[in-house]
Amino acid sequence: MKIGLVINPQSGVGGSVALKGSDGAELQELAKRRDGEPKGSKRAHAFLERLLLIIDDLTIELSWKTWGDEMGETVLRSQQVDFEVLGHPKSPTAGADTSEACSVISGAGVDILIFVG
């Protein structure tokens, strides 16, 4: 099974400091100044831990495709699974990075695309 993974590394950073969302560089910077904590990577890590336990019991072979750095690569590397990075985000990440990642990974023939935000 071919699985695509895209993580919004900035998700949750605004909500944790009483901002409504985290879209845009200005809101992300304000959230960081208020010690906002992004939640996307933590959510993805928790999801993958559970998924990999289930998959391991079923002996299903997985092929992962993801985007670079915090948009998938870092979390998959921490889980010690084989994966392919199909591109890299700009820094800081923006909505355009998510759109590009989803488009490229979907076009790579994955069976399912998992988005964590």
List where the protein language model places each region.
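Short, acidic/small-residue loops that bind anionic groups at enzyme active sites
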Residues: 116-117
